[in-house]
Amino acid sequence: MTVGVCYFPEHWSRERWETDISQMAEAGIEYVRMGEFAWRRIEPERGTFDFAWLDEAVELIGKFGMKAVLCTPTATPPKWLVDEHPDVRQREQDGTPREWGSRRFTCFNSPTYRSETERIVSVLTDRYADNPHVAGWQTDNEFGCHETVTCYCEDCGEAFSEWLADRYESVADLNDAWGTTFWSQQYDDFESIDPPKPTPAANHPSRVLAYERFSNDSVAEYNRLHAALIREANDEWFVTHNFMGGFSLDAFRLAADLDFLSWDSYPTGFVQDRQPDTPTVDELRAGNPDQVSMNHDLQRGAKGKPFWVMEQQPGDINWPPQSPQPADGAMRLWAHHAVAHGADAVVYFRWRRCRQGQEQYHAGLRRQDGSPDRGYREASTAADELFDLDSVDASVALVHDYESLWATRSQPLSPDWDYWNHLRTYYDALRARGVQVDIVSPEATLERYDAVVAPTLYLVGDELSTALTDYVDSGGCLLLGARTGEKDPYNRLHESLAPGPLTALTGAQVARHETLPDHVETRLSYDGATYEFRTWASWLAPEVGVPRGEYRTGEAAGNTAIVRNAAGDGSVTYCGCWPGDDLADALVTELLDAAGVEYTERFPDGVRVMERDGYTWALNFTSDPVTLTVPDSTGFLLGESTVDAFDTAVLDGSIRGVGLASE
């Protein structure tokens, strides 16, 4: 386990560098990330390179016993390149070019930009191929940030046509698969299929989904170019990429070309702009632990190995609606939280607050005058406390499908439908019970998991249906959620009623569905108790499945909401609605009991426990102290039974028997 920092020597005078880097070493920092936005400094004009400054910075890092993580600088090409080749810019859906002047405005499919990428990455990696102080590379920076996965330029139009031609035997097959007879949308050839541009009504959902798939494949192909060039120069370097939380960019697609995944964690920002509820005061100070850890578990699950937090919030940040100061202790708390969920490194962004540009109001571990800020002290403390660990061993998987995210986003049927928040309902319920969760793709091998939760497998074909059926037949316990199996992989309704090919497994079909706004009363009964649900309700018609839940309000009253079916040596529960928190807890605890998975009492919001490598972390994201109950045989490596506000304790033992003392 290690701590790192992001550094921008190009922002500071050379006279300061040695002081900065020596102070990093004093703080216990082991890795320094550099160079992601430095293309113009490296190549001030075409073919003229200035490596002296970067050479010196890398040597200083090595001098003080640390390692450099370098980045390919392709997120910010220099002005001279864009002036030479304005065609490298992305275009909005209406054709407006995304202009030079910030970052992430270039097209992944531009042949010119791919050529320029190959040129600068080759020069950089060749330069440092034999440098012992360079440990590895980050490809580019935050693919997809600022809604830039999709581009609608001519290069993308041509590439989209070619992409479709590679995937369909003929345009007639495409017309049949998409159902283009609707509104007379048949195509005569692949070349006539444009990216979906603005239209008076919605674009065809199959076309929209295909363009999402194509766009994500384009990012993956562009990332593959970087990774191949890096490994060609030195196959001992690691290659990673820093994803962002809650993005629709398919991390699973990129994972194959990376040694491990990384992501950028900004808890007080995400809680403001990536969840619908108004943040509590505690969340404004420390974020929501489940929102953050779901991203930890996604980065870990996508590759099946430990991940890095490549940018950890160091203090106040500039980009969310509000810029609250994190609570005292939050920066240390976040480091422990990441490690407990499988991180092998936490890299703080940035070393010093920048004096210029768009991120002047983004804190660093040190202030712009070089004096230490709170983040510096907390990062130093975390560096002293954290230790090496084996990987997280999760017995529960949560299946996350980016393609279902894209498809339901284009046809939500309610302004309140949100794929991520529906996923969070089940994820949060598992985390409140202390359960470690691998977030995996629909293509993942499920047999190693005792229990699997699949909240929204909206697009289901025969292959996925077979995999889920085989999992249950072999003794697995499966929980399916609302909107499961509504569509086929081409985004068409199945010829049979939902859940389509999963009907035999679930033992039920969807007779009707409805969406309801928040002010409508929505209640159901489940196992003799009454619960709330929200937004979505599928009225289930059991065939061989056993009814377990029944709607009690509105037009749905008397219809089945939840069924359970035994299949082979396992079982499946199918919940047709979006459950409230209490119902989600009841569903997951029944699942865990059936699967024999150990879990804790239900912890309150903001207080979480999790186990890694035989140690248990208790993390308090609230402003009130909490007192733990632990077995007599369990000791504390860090902290004690009373965990103060925004503090952590580390127990030398499993989660078994860990709870909260009653008030």
Swiss-Prot record:
<dbReference type="InterPro" id="IPR013529">
    <property type="entry name" value="Glyco_hydro_42_N"/>
</dbReference>
<feature type="binding site">
    <location>
        <position position="151"/>
    </location>
    <ligand>
        <name>Zn(2+)</name>
    </ligand>
</feature>
<feature type="binding site">
    <location>
        <position position="107"/>
    </location>
    <ligand>
        <name>Zn(2+)</name>
    </ligand>
</feature>
<feature type="active site" description="Nucleophile">
    <location>
        <position position="311"/>
    </location>
</feature>
<keyword id="KW-0479">Metal-binding</keyword>
<keyword id="KW-0862">Zinc</keyword>
<dbReference type="GO" id="GO:0009341">
    <property type="term" value="C:beta-galactosidase complex"/>
</dbReference>
<dbReference type="GO" id="GO:0004565">
    <property type="term" value="F:beta-galactosidase activity"/>
</dbReference>
<dbReference type="InterPro" id="IPR013738">
    <property type="entry name" value="Beta_galactosidase_Trimer"/>
</dbReference>
<dbReference type="Pfam" id="PF02449">
    <property type="entry name" value="Glyco_hydro_42"/>
</dbReference>
<dbReference type="InterPro" id="IPR003476">
    <property type="entry name" value="Glyco_hydro_42"/>
</dbReference>
<dbReference type="Pfam" id="PF08533">
    <property type="entry name" value="Glyco_hydro_42C"/>
</dbReference>
<keyword id="KW-0378">Hydrolase</keyword>
<feature type="binding site">
    <location>
        <position position="141"/>
    </location>
    <ligand>
        <name>substrate</name>
    </ligand>
</feature>
<dbReference type="InterPro" id="IPR029062">
    <property type="entry name" value="Class_I_gatase-like"/>
</dbReference>
<dbReference type="Pfam" id="PF08532">
    <property type="entry name" value="Glyco_hydro_42M"/>
</dbReference>
<dbReference type="GO" id="GO:0006012">
    <property type="term" value="P:galactose metabolic process"/>
</dbReference>
<dbReference type="GO" id="GO:0046872">
    <property type="term" value="F:metal ion binding"/>
</dbReference>
<dbReference type="InterPro" id="IPR013739">
    <property type="entry name" value="Beta_galactosidase_C"/>
</dbReference>
<feature type="binding site">
    <location>
        <begin position="359"/>
        <end position="362"/>
    </location>
    <ligand>
        <name>substrate</name>
    </ligand>
</feature>
<comment type="function">
    <text>When overexpressed, cleaves several different substrates including o-nitrophenyl-beta-D-galactopyranoside (ONPG), chromogen 5-bromo-4-chloro-3-indolyl-beta-D-galactopyranoside (X-Gal) and lactulose, but not lactose. Also has beta-D-fucosidase activity. No beta-L-fucosidase, beta-glucosidase, beta-arabinosidase or beta-xylosidase activity.</text>
</comment>
<comment type="subunit">
    <text>Homodimer.</text>
</comment>
<dbReference type="InterPro" id="IPR013780">
    <property type="entry name" value="Glyco_hydro_b"/>
</dbReference>
<feature type="binding site">
    <location>
        <position position="103"/>
    </location>
    <ligand>
        <name>substrate</name>
    </ligand>
</feature>
<protein>
    <recommendedName>
        <fullName>Beta-galactosidase BgaH</fullName>
        <ecNumber>3.2.1.23</ecNumber>
    </recommendedName>
</protein>
<comment type="similarity">
    <text>Belongs to the glycosyl hydrolase 42 family.</text>
</comment>
<dbReference type="InterPro" id="IPR017853">
    <property type="entry name" value="Glycoside_hydrolase_SF"/>
</dbReference>
<keyword id="KW-0326">Glycosidase</keyword>
<feature type="binding site">
    <location>
        <position position="156"/>
    </location>
    <ligand>
        <name>Zn(2+)</name>
    </ligand>
</feature>
<feature type="binding site">
    <location>
        <position position="319"/>
    </location>
    <ligand>
        <name>substrate</name>
    </ligand>
</feature>
<feature type="active site" description="Proton donor">
    <location>
        <position position="142"/>
    </location>
</feature>
<feature type="binding site">
    <location>
        <position position="153"/>
    </location>
    <ligand>
        <name>Zn(2+)</name>
    </ligand>
</feature>
